[in-house]
Amino acid sequence: MTTDTIVAQATAPGRGGVGIIRISGDKASDVAMAVLGHLPKTRYADYCDFKSASGQVIDQGIALFFKGPNSFTGEDVLELQGHGGQIVLDMLIKRVMEVGGIRIAKPGEFSEQAFMNDKLDLTQAEAIADLIDATSEQAAKSALQSLQGEFSKEVHELVDQVTNLRLYVEAAIDFPDEEVDFLSDGKIANALYKIIDKLDLVQASAKQGSIIREGMKVVIAGRPNAGKSSLLNALAGKESAIVTEIAGTTRDVLREHIHLDGMPLHIIDTAGLRDTTDTVEQIGIERAWNEINSADRVLFMVDGTTTAAVDPHTIWPDFVDRLPSNLGVTVIRNKADLTGEDLMMTEEQGYSVYRISAKTGLGVEELKQHLKSLMGYQSNLEGGFIARRRHLEALELAAGHLQLGKEQLEVYLAGELLAEELRMCQLALSEITGRFTSDDLLGKIFSSFCIGK
């Protein structure tokens, strides 16, 4: 943990109505005396001159002083709010540096200091960056929920429950006379099952929070001339892809980023899949499979005029066999305007099958609702929180340890091994909030922040 005094511009670079310089550390009060000539009253806005070492006025504006630990970083903090011209702000930072013992802050260092001083935990610190980077209203709302501690609260409750159960198991092992057959009396099993159920709910919420932040990647795949590019255009609401009657028109990957009621969706149109001797087309098909293998969902486009089948194993078994085993597939029977099929959804052999006309737009709205449901969309997400991929990985790791602990309890009645799995679960959960986190991870997280945050 650094004890340096740091300074940075807190507002975006460039011209603006207001520009803010933020200073945090022991020398913040020295800066106030040097630049303002006095120390402003704590937590009061003070309109004054910002002066150079020779007494010349650099700018005029509002000075705010926050005495640590009652500040964002937990240290003494001084904010100088002046005019937003970049030259003026650069002059002001240069003046602050003249005080001595002050350096320019690294990206995210103010938030890192707040984390180190227990003003917020790691999920709250990450939520600051997520709030700034939010690309939709729902993402902003969810990031604010995380900033206010909604995600942290869920994780802390889980950690407390796991810790209490672990202590009970270890105490029963150390003092066997106090609890006879403690592993088979049902108390531990019931407590463990409740924790597993609670973690399942948190995982589901975190997965949705991750989708809100990062979006779901949906790849449109199928044979040439099945209508893939027409579907991309219909979902995007604009002519993003060239559409012709010539099979193989699309030879490269096309991407569109849209929002469905605040839920970000990454739509990928790919080259038609077929055997070909055309070198350029072969490259496009290889890229298509790369996108399919990293997708969250595949929309398998079928030209409804070529087959009446609905089961993808019947339509194209080689395609289905090559798909990753855990990849979800939605079958899209296209060209319903030509086949006369009813625009409806059915479940066939575990697959959702939609009949649409990408050309006319018939059935596309129903498909959008399907995609929203896959993303876990709810009309009221006021209690939702934002989540990152590392959070999902930590929750998955914690869930794995709980399942191993459950096996040790149910199959082997191994109290010591159950206690160890609970300890590992506790560590995985605590890494989410930063209670137990490596310096490398902290550096990676905070380095992605804006300077001045």
Curated annotation (Swiss-Prot):
Listed binding positions for (6S)-5-formyl-5,6,7,8-tetrahydrofolate are 22, 79, 119, 453
Q: What is its EC number?
A: 3.6.-.-
Organism of this sequence: Shewanella baltica (strain OS185)
- Cellular localisation: Cytoplasm
Q: Which GO terms describe its biological process?
A: tRNA methylation; tRNA wobble uridine modification
Cite the TrmE-type G domain residue spans from the record.
215-376
**What main location does UniProt list?**
cytoplasm
Q: Which cofactor does it need?
A: K(+)
Q: What is this protein called?
A: tRNA modification GTPase MnmE
Q: Which Pfam families match?
A: MMR_HSR1, MnmE_helical, TrmE_N
Task: State the function annotated in the UniProt record.
Answer: Exhibits a very high intrinsic GTPase hydrolysis rate. Involved in the addition of a carboxymethylaminomethyl (cmnm) group at the wobble position (U34) of certain tRNAs, forming tRNA-cmnm(5)s(2)U34.
* Keyword Hydrolase applies: yes
